[in-house]
């Protein structure tokens, strides 16, 4: 079961990698790629990053730069036209990215026709006219401490933050001030965060994050603070230790390393986080955050 599951995940991601190679000049929206791979849009990007070792955006940008390197080697197309074809709006931005990738500016690269390029974990490079047969996955997640838990639905009061992920503190301050003043924090409720957009993908100004506190059935929305229900069911739980701004690495290992080897798939619902200690009184390196990923049995029919 586990070997089949891992191979299934690899096949689905390989399908996406092949599609990207063949449609490098398309918009390549994450929703479209998620549908192509039969993944929930909530989770596709983290699974992709965890298995491939780079985000979709990073992968596409690198392939376009590799294509640009080939064009510089072969022809006389102007550097600015090659830059525009690679998705850059200026010669300067293209030159910076190209030099970072190949160790030489485009004009220098064209003269010497060779330069260093970074080794990538996946082993996937721009190869026009060839069929992508396999890719190397990131080796991770096998040593993670993960528990499967069945949760009851949780009723939560929440405030929604729209904006940079690192600015959610003000939303939490507002939520806890109101809830504390109204006497709803006395029973040690759980503090949950639901990030409905991936900070590595969504523009900072559009990230939606719900700061949540568990409440009982007697709590009523009061205008500013609303109520929602976090779905019950089976969840995989792992604990992230350390700064909140390093949560992305744990997500990548969890969903791109552990999950494909677990025999499970994710439901079409967001992950959520439970904050186990107070950032106001805890050293950043000692912060503990439980990550819950919603599970469903993996289908045997593909």
Predicted features along the sequence, with ranges:
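Short, Lys/Arg-enriched, Trp-marked, Pro/Gly-tolerant hinge/linker segments that flank
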Residues: 1-18, 37, 54-55, 61
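Basic, amphipathic alpha-helical hairpins
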Residues: 15-28, 48, 69-78, 98
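Central "turn" residue of the DNA-binding helix-turn-helix
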Residues: 32-39, 53, 76, 87-89
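The alpha-helix within a helix-turn-helix
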Residues: 34, 83-84, 95
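Short hydrophobic/aromatic patch on the recognition helix
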Residues: 42-44, 48, 93-94, 98
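Conserved MFS/SLC helix-loop-helix module at the cytosolic interface between two early adjacent transmembrane helices
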Residues: 47-49, 56-57
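A solvent-exposed interaction/effector surface
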Residues: 54, 66, 70-74, 78-80, ...
């Amino acid at each position: 079961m586990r070997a089949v599951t891992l191979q299934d995940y690899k096949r689905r991601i390989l399908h996406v990698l092949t599609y990207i190679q063949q449609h490098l000049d398309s918009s390549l929206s994450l929703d479209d790629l998620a549908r192509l791979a039969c993944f929930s849009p909530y989770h596709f990007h983290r699974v992709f990053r965890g298995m491939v070792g780079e985000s979709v955006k990073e992968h596409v940008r690198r392939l376009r730069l590799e294509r640009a390197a080939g064009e510089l080697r072969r022809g006389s197309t102007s550097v600015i036209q090659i830059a525009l074809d690679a998705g850059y709006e200026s010669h300067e931005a293209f030159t910076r990215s190209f030099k970072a990738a190949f160790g030489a500016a485009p004009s220098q690269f064209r003269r010497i026709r060779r330069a260093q390029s970074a080794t990538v974990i996946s082993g996937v490079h721009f190869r026009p006219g060839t069929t992508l047969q396999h890719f190397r996955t990131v080796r991770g997640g096998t040593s993670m401490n993960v528990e499967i838990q069945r949760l009851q639905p949780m009723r939560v009061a929440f405030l929604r933050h729209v904006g940079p992920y690192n600015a959610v503190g003000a939303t939490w301050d507002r939520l806890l001030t109101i809830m504390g003043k109204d006497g709803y924090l006395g029973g040690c409720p759980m503090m949950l965060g639901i990030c409905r957009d991936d900070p590595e993908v969504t523009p900072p100004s559009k990230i939606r994050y719900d700061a949540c506190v568990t409440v009982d059935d007697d709590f009523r929305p009061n205008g500013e603070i609303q109520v929602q229900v976090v779905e019950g069911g089976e969840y995989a739980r792992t604990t992230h230790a350390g700064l909140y701004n390093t949560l992305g690495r744990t997500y990548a290992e969890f969903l791109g390393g552990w999950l494909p080897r677990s025999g499970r798939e994710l439901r079409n619902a967001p992950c959520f986080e439970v904050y186990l200690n107070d950032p106001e009184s805890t050293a950043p390196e000692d912060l503990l955050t439980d990550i819950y990923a919603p599970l469903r049995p993996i289908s045997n029919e593909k």
